[in-house]
Amino acid sequence: MDRRTLLKLLAATALAGCNTQDDATKDLKVVVAGAGIIGASIAYHLAKAGAVVTIIDKQGPATHASRGTFAWINATWAKQPRSYHAFSQSSVANWHDLHHALNLPIRWGGSLEWFENPERETKLATQIAEQVEWGEPARMVDAAEFAILEPNVAFNTGVTAAYSPNDGTVDPVLATQKLLAAAEQMGATLRYPSELTNVELANGRLTSVETSSGSIPADRLVLATGAAPDIAARIAGIELPQRTRPGVIAITEPMPRLLNRIVSAPGIHMHQRDDGRIVLGEQDGVPQNEAHALRLAGRPNNFPSPELAQEHAQRMLAVAKTFAPGIAAASIDDVYIGWRPLPIDGHPVIGASSNRPDTYIAIMHSGVTLAPIVGQLATLELLDGIVVDNLDDYRPGRVFNEIKRY
């Protein structure tokens, strides 16, 4: 969707109201800190709109949360309340535009999800009924329909599964790289390794961004820095309470087609990319003990040794094999610890810092789902001086109440 069309859409619908400021600005120099999927989308949309864009990252594109994500594009039952669900639905739809515009590595086909606990299974059915009321084409399916949708997955005939046909998956590393490459083709500059260290102000206004690779003139700074714990407070002067947690992603070598859709089974998530690689994500998280706490204190992305990484991946494969026996033949290619940015109320943080209005924050879980719409709306706010009312619930200055949604 181009910027002109998006402006017309926002003006014409109640979904995302917006108020135009009198001092709309154009041709701004914008530094985007963070070359993950959110930063890449914002940079792409800014460059497309004519901004002078520089993207910086202390390591490189998609080397942090965006590498360690299961990469599930969805607007499922966890997206509460209804306004957040609608926001997610809009972004899922916008992924189709990006898919075709940039030939992104996305696989559509939906998801199947179920639980072993009878009470949780009953609650899931209630949640899916609510999703249907909200316009999501989801439904519960029995074992017979499940076998048609996913014939290579063993399914307990005593339960039903939630089928969400609009869901998809993306290769987050390749998608990030393609978004950044497209931004560069439109004049953006990508600098790495280049760590954000400070900002320079003159009369209270941003003049430059200081990095480990030098100073960059800037009118605006975007913080798309994921789970980094202190950057928002240090650079934007605002505390963002997070309960950041690790999640392990294991990726197999390419193998013949086994899975048609995303499968969210008890204890394991799995999907298969177009290149044949199967992506595994664990559900239960790391054990809560002192040894793991010490090991994870520095937020590592890699296991202490390749042997430990393989041991962990083999445990994940063993769980996956109970549902998809054909995965027993898989060989593990990569194991990575991803650190997910999780604001404690489960919602994204999007908007300018009240303490430093020249600094725009875009930090969230579900970054893969929300990347397209966040890129579009952040560009409207940064370049067109538009205040998008639909983002009001996600501003950095809100009151954060802890709600566990995932």
Language model features: what each stretch is:
Residues A93, L104-I106, E116-M186, R191-Y192, ...:
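Flavin (FAD/FMN) cofactor-binding and adjacent substrate-gating region
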Residues P256-R356:
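Active-site lid/adjacent beta-loop-alpha segment flanking the redox-cofactor pocket in flavoenzymes
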Residues K321-Y406:
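C-terminal catalytic lobe of FAD-dependent flavoproteins
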Residues A71-L149, G267-H269, R277, P300, ...:
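Dinucleotide-binding Rossmann-like beta1-alpha1 core, especially the glycine-rich loop
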Residues V30-T54:
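N-terminal Rossmann-like FAD-binding beta1-loop-alpha1 element of flavoenzymes
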Residues K48-S66:
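Glycine-rich FAD pyrophosphate-binding loop
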